[in-house]
Amino acid sequence: MTTMKIIYTYTDEAPALATHSLLPVVQAFADKAGVAVETRDISLAARVLAAFDLAPDALAELGELAKTPEANIIKLPNVSASVPQLKAAVAELQAKGFAVPDYPEDPQSEQERAARTAYDAVKGSAVNPVLREGNSDRRAPASVKSYARSHPHSMGPWSPDSRSHVATMTDGDFRHSETSVTLADAATLRIELQATDGTTTVLLEGLGVEAGEIIDAAVMRKAALEQFLAREIADARDKDVLFSVHLKATMMKVSDPIIFGHVVKQYFAGVFEQYAQELASVGADPNQGLGGVLADLQRLPAETRQQVEQAIQATYASGPALAQVDSSRGITNLHVPSDVIVDASMPAAIRTSGQMWNAQDQQQDTKFVIPDSSYAALYSVTIEDCRAHGAFDPTTMGTVPNVGLMAQKAEEYGSHDKTFEIAAAGTVRVVDEAGTVLLSREVEPGDVFRACQTKDAPVRDWVQLAVRRARATGAPTVFWLDETRAHDAQVLAKVHACLAEQDVDGLVIEFLDVEQATRYTLERVRRGEETISVTGNVLRDYLTDLFPILELGTSAKMLSIVPLMQGGGLFETGAGGSAPKHVQQLVKEDYLRWDSLGEFLALSVSLEFLGEQTGNARASLLGTTLDTATGRVLEENRSPARKVGQIDNRGSHFYLALYWAQALAAQTEDAEAAALFGPLAASLAEAESVVVAELLAVQGHPADLGGYYSVDKDKTDAVMRPSATFNAALASF
């Protein structure tokens, strides 16, 4: 017997706070269908505690559950921790009395090395790859799309004279150095560096691979990167545009902080040359951003520190001007590696007239530096399109659902354990147990070597999912694959073999590289048409932010389904992040503007999936009526506003409960359910003005959560459930 259970993940920041308010509603309703909704804490704080055996390892438990047919997991956004975030969480846990060690910057002892290994496993995007035992099906639900068309979000106008542009490398990057092979047989591989002095260093051993698996190797060359950055910094100064860099230091937790460090060092080249010894003496690490370097300077003698700080200010003055993250606090694009994440920052800029903010808090044309050229054309073509045709119009634009390859840590997003900053010149080789060299790349000191894996079963599953979505929608379906790229050529061979086994009669299926696919898709978007994108793991991430942000104003409103390969379901609540600024506003003035629409959508499909899997008709009914209620929340404008004095996240949860109860009371297919929910619908409707008044009354004052990464449950419940009337109605139900 399949258990009637849904796991609702407790995560971080704004979505975690929203859970304190929404979950009691969900549990009360689901209980009437015999469905238990249980939480598992996979927040950053909980994962740190689990790493040192101070809490259950809920993530490992869910990783195992995801490999079973019973899995029904609702996954909310979580923090992909950068080192500064990780250190802040550790400090908070230590202050609460938990015996977790400091994060060791430069581990010396065996104990410190063990702690560093444990923390490195928690760092970056450590959650999603464990749960994603399937591929991704992301699309804008019809109700959300129609709402966006009738209530368009703001889109900054584009000038045909815009000087904004993408700068990317033309050689010496991962894209241009990639080599790839498909293995005929299962094997155990090792990655080794054969230095020019004759020594061999094993970088990784015991790497198990399956028959049919694709292995890639590529190198980001330090010398080429430095030359490229120096050239682009000078060019931004000459063109008088803002300089900005767009990486993904959260997910690409080994390679991208190193690349980010090179950007910091190149921009402040004079400072790092003149004060090399002084900076080294306090362990200043550009990979942690300018913010980290400035913090380290505090340990220098006052006079020296002032000299370095003045040199930094002089660099700012000579330009180019840097794009700002928070101009009021002087936080630039180069302060924190995790502040500017390419898949969120580029769509935001494209939506804002192709501009970013300068130190004077004005929008300005910008150079968007995306060093590796693998996917940069997505953004350069979109910028060219907006320059030629103006901003997109949400009232008429089409839609771009995505079928994304991500199961079993496919491609770059599973490469962290196979990414190395090279210490000595030589050749990095990928070798099997018989000593056969499968792949090799020449390297110099400071180069970043990266190997990726893509297993056969996920590719087959991805192609089948693409065909199912093409069949269900009738929309043209584009595989974003570039036959001139080593990895993509291997994938294409598999795709063609899989399609030969499928019924594709009457389907329109195209194969285009990133540049061609972007042009083709944008032309159709401007005509109001639907185009399915079938992409690898990185483009899945990029496209499911870019198009939802342009179409809907946010990627948090996407339906994000992961049909797990063993038959279960993972339902992700949108494709956005965890909104730290929303938490800051809540703490300051007890107003949470987080929109739980993503949770509503995911819960609806989760309940319908459970109903189908188990024959629980009432669970299915809860799902369909929740969809109806969600539509009403949108149409009657009950989503959170932005400012104090209007309803926020908590108010939207009250209206969802009201409309959901009313939909259940009004339906005729389950008379018992109608009778059960009728009284609740009546009492909530009667109490509406009282509940809204209670919710608004708390706004405008600071709120105490008793923590940030590790909040106090009772305090946070009190903050997030301030309406005694609403709480009593749910409790008596």
Describe each region flagged by the PLM.
Residues 615-616, 669-675:
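Structural helix-adjacent loops and short alpha-helical linkers that scaffold large soluble proteins
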Residues 711-733:
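C-terminal accessory extensions/subdomains outside the catalytic/core fold
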Residues 2-261, 270-494, 498-520, 524-650, ...:
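Extended, well-ordered protein cores
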